[in-house]
Structure formats: C-alpha cells, structure tokens
Amino acid sequence: MIQSAAPSCRRWWALGFAAVALWVDSTSGWTTQRPPMAGLRRFQSSAWYMSSSSTEKPTTSGTINGGGGKQKAASQPKKTAGIVYDAQKIRNFSIIAHIDHGKSTLADRLLETTQTVAQRDMEAQLLDNMDLERERGITIKLQAARVLYQARDGEMYCLNLIDTPGHVDFSYEVSRSLAACEGALLVVDASQGIEAQTLANVYLALENDLEIIPILNKIDLPAADPERVAEEIEATIGLDCSGIVHASAKTGIGIDDILERIVQMVPPPPAATGGPFRALIFDSYYDAYRGVIVFFRVMDGEVSQGDKVRFLASDAEHDVTEVGIMQPNQVPVDCLHAGEVGYLWGNIKDVLDARVGDTIVLAKEYKESASKGKSPPIEALPGYADSVPMVYCGLFPVDADQYESLRDALGKLRLNDAALSYEPESSGAMGFGFRCGFLGLLHMEIVQERLQREYDIDLIVTAPSVVYKVKKEHQEEFFIDTPAKMPDLGRNDVALEPYVRMEVLTPSEYNGAIIELGQERRGDLIDIKFLTPTRSTIVYELPLAEVITDFFDQLKSRTKGYASMEYSLIDYRASDLVRLDVKINYEMAPPLACVVHRDKAQSIGRRLCASLKDLIPRQMFKIPIQACIGVKVIASESISPMRKDVLAKCYGGDISRKKKLLQKQAKGKKRMKSIGKVNVPQEAFMAVLKLNE
C-alpha cells in the first residue's frame, strides 16, 4: 500500500499497462477499482458532474452513464450512482458552411479550447480522418464529438458537436445530421461573403427548425469586410446580425464567445417522459473487427449495453455489445439517455441494416407494442428516405485479371457507403466491369480515387449519365440508367429526364454570362435577385444531364472563379430525347453512346466524331467513325491510315512490278480492316464530357 505524508490525502494513480485507476485513501487504507480508461486526462474529460450549483461535488466519481433505470421527467434530474443526469445541460449543435469557409478549423479550435483533445494530440482537420479529406480540404464522412464546457455562469454543459459533409452531393446526410441537433453554427467567410452552399445549408437548417447562430470567420484576413458580409446575411437570410460573433478559427479569436452563444441560444433537447426508446441514425461505418459502428442521437428513452435493438427500415435485430460516446475517440459507457449522442455496435455485418435516417428501437418494447395490437408498434422518426443514385457510370479494369479484385473492392467500399450501388456489366469493347450509381459527380470522383489509391486498380471510366424515364404505349414506365439501353421511341412514346433547380451566386457583372450559359444548356430562367448592389443570385431550372458534364467548369471559367452554385432535384419532365450511337470501324461502341436532345444531336455528333478522330491512334488501315441515330448516320469522320512506302525498293524498271506491289498492299489492308481491332484510349470515353464546349 502506498502511504501519504498528509492525512486524508487522496491521489489518483494510473497503471498504464492495465488502464486501471486506483483511488487510495491513506487513512482508511482501502482502494476502489475504477472503469478502464486511457489515462487520467481521458477519465477526467469523460466525467460529467451536474448539479444546481457549480461548487457541489458528487460523493462518488464516475461517468454520466454510470447505471441504468428508467428516465424521470425532464424537470427532475436523474441521479445514477451519485451522478446527476440533466437534459437541460445538453446542447446538440452542428456547424454548416460553404466549402473552405473554415468549418473543420473551427471544430478543431472548439475541441482545443475546451481541452477535449490534449495539445500534443491536436492536428489540423482533426475530425477529418481520410487522406482524401485532408488533401481536398473537404469533409466526406461526418464525425461527432462530445465537449464538456464550464460556462461563465459556473455550470458545466455537455456540448455534442455533429460535423457534417459540406458538399451538395451529400445533402441527405446533412439533413439527417441536422435533424439530430437543436442548433447550428452558420460560418461565413468575412472576406468572401455568402455563397451558394451557405444558402442551401441554411434552408436545410430552417426545415429542421434549428436555432441558427451566425459567425463571421477569418476576420484576421486583410480582405475581410465584416460589415458588408453582415448586411448580406441580414438581407439574404433575415438573421439578426447586430451581435454577430467575429471570429478567427485559425488564431482562436472569438472561440469563447461562440461557446457562450451555444450555451445561451441553442435550446436543450426535449426529454421524453417514460416513452419507448427511439434513436435517429445519422451515420455508420464498417470496422473490420467490430462490424458496423452506428452513430445515433437518442430522441426518447434510453439504451444500455446488452439490450437488443431493432432497426425499423430494415427490420434487422442485433444485441448491443457496446454503447459509448465520442470525445472524439470512442469511449464506452453503460447507458445513453434521451438527448445524448453516441455510438453502438453489436456484430452488425451489413451497413444496409443501419441506414442513415433510420430509427432504432428496443426489440422488447417493439414486440410488447405489437402484441397489444398497435400499428405501427412504435412510430418511426420522420424524414427517412433511401439514397437514390443520381449519376451512373461504368467502371472497367484495364487488366481483365483484376475483375475479381474490382468486385471485392466495390464490396468493401459498399460496407462504408450505403449510397453506392453497383451491378455487373459487360461490353464487347471493354470486357467485364460494373455499372455504378453515385449521389453526384464528387461522390463518383471520390469512389474512383479510393479504388485506384487504396486497392491499386487501374480503371477505365465511361462518361457519367443520369437516370431517364421512358413511357411506352400500353406499357408501364421504366427507368434507364445506361444510354445503350435507351429504346427507339415510337410516335406515342415519351422520354422524361430529371430536372434540377439551380441557384448561382455571383458578382452582378457576370449576370449576362451566366444567363447565356443557362440558355445554352436548355435552362429556364426563374428569378434574379440582387442581394447587394454588387452581388446577385440567379435561379434556373435545367436538365441534370446538362449539369453533370462540364457545367461547373464553364461557370467558373465565365465568371473568373467568383460564382458558386447549388442544385437540387425537382422532378422529371418530358423531352425530345434520342440515343446517339457511335460506330468505330463499323462496330458499335456502347460505352460511347449518349442520350441527347434531338435539336442538339447533329452538332454533338460532329464534335464527338472530331474528338474521337484526334484521340484514337492511327492504324495501318482506314478507320471510319460514325455518329448514328438508329440506322441514320448524322456525322462521320475517318482516321487516315499510316502509309508504308512499298515502292521504296523499286528503282525504276517495269511499271507492272510497282502495280503488283500496290495491289498486294491494298489486299493486305483490306484483310486487316476486316479483322483488325481498334484500341480506344481512356481519353476517348471522357470525350463525351466535353461535347458542350
């Protein structure tokens, strides 16, 4: 036993190899074993003392989730093993911002200021775990973290930060994350002002009835203009910016004020009074050793280790092996109550069992309600929807021997990404591969890059396409996700394509260029709003097929990089669409087929043939390239053959000798043309992307 010189002196001793804490009392000589921990700092940060006064201390130390039992009413704090659980001291919030406005940096400063993460463990973009996220400077997979903060009123508050992806491709995931919160920090760059994604995130926050706290970030930049940007926010969004927080996530300016605003303005979560357990899933990922890890927000009731839970959308049931909180590393606890954010795992092998937006309930409570004849036994939380792919493309391995490797790699990515869909596809020109569905172009690029980087697979990627609807006479409508599957339409048949509503924020001097671009892409101008005398927003409705190619590149080019855009799917509309086929050496090339509007078919066919002529290498025989609608050729080009001078060895003599050599060469080229194969490079398949230039 370790003796102390001072009477009644209590000390913590951490045994690093066993991660066990001993509480030694020198007067009584007894020890108490504490729960496993990663060190004294970790245990102190996970202990949460709640009392009516900041000077009161519980007699026994532990975490907030020290025991089980049914939760009392929200007005009566619940004591568990000497710990007071008080939902009124919980604040669930998210950070929303346009790309590169400082969202991840602000999250780093909040974790650092509250000492949630030790200074030696801090690194830039702490919540961004993937290398791709750090390289691109974007958030792809959302994260969550619990922060303990002692406010200026002396009370200790539990702040649950739920980080969100910032790109429009992941808007559904963002909406489910915001549904798990009561408040949101709206971060706006003080030098750039409001951008398109800023407005999109604000709309999502308003739909979920969140308290929005505006923050001007990067005020330390020489180009910062806080007064102008604050006026933009008031004029555009309608938020009161009289007391807006001026902050710099890089230098730490204003971080304490932000924490105080969270405590004062974000309402506490509504706590249920004895209802059944319900929780909202806002993210999940696959771990090779533990299976699927589910991140959720408890809406009603409580869940403990050992409970059996049911996922309502998939009807899957699993035993809970572990529940815990994120700080931001995962820390196991005994129980999670209404209003808290945490994780669970329990030998779940398929991420489809725990989809984003689904509702978790206790299997026992579900069966009890079902036995009483309730329908449904437990009401699901609103807002769940299956992820619907918006963009499709073909992925083919360069080496045919890597087909199995590609299938295994897609299966592993699918475990972490429920929005990714794929099915086998074969092509005479490309061999065997997969037809993959994605939420958008960024999602597609990320999956391709991960396949090449993490699994070392060289890919041939076909041009992306959207999903079309076809209504044939006397038949039910059906979907087309591959241009080669588009049928020839009769007089009474109808083809429909997806339309999006797009908002473009731009300096007003570029309004004309953007309107011209919208008209070129078959768009309908809906509205023009002037946010300030120098900035405006232009609203268009246009086909998604015109957006997924090079629209964003053209927008940046015509506005010198100043414009930003955001779009959302609205509906399907009838269009005069045709399938444009490409024949190379009189053979159909299905990967190069595309669906276009009839009015643009001839011009697009000419540009496509011209592009392929430049990209396909010359052969020893002539290669014709044809663009066709049905059996009608609307454009054509030909690649001239490389010429071999068979007369070089003839130095005069009879002309018949030369004719014989030329006839022999022509005969050989004719045979070569009939059996020869044309190698089409990867760049040729992406030529479809540049047809609108």
UniProtKB/Swiss-Prot annotation:
Membrane topology classification: Peripheral membrane protein
Chain positions recorded as GTP binding sites: 97-104, 163-167, 217-220
GO biological process, one term: translation
Major localization class: mitochondrion
Keyword vocabulary terms for this entry: GTP-binding, Hydrolase, Membrane, Mitochondrion, Mitochondrion inner membrane, Nucleotide-binding, Protein biosynthesis
UniProt xrefs under SUPFAM superfamilies: EF-G C-terminal domain-like (SSF54980), P-loop containing nucleoside triphosphate hydrolases (SSF52540), Translation proteins (SSF50447)
Domain of life of the native organism: Eukaryota
Name recorded for this polypeptide: Translation factor GUF1 homolog, mitochondrial
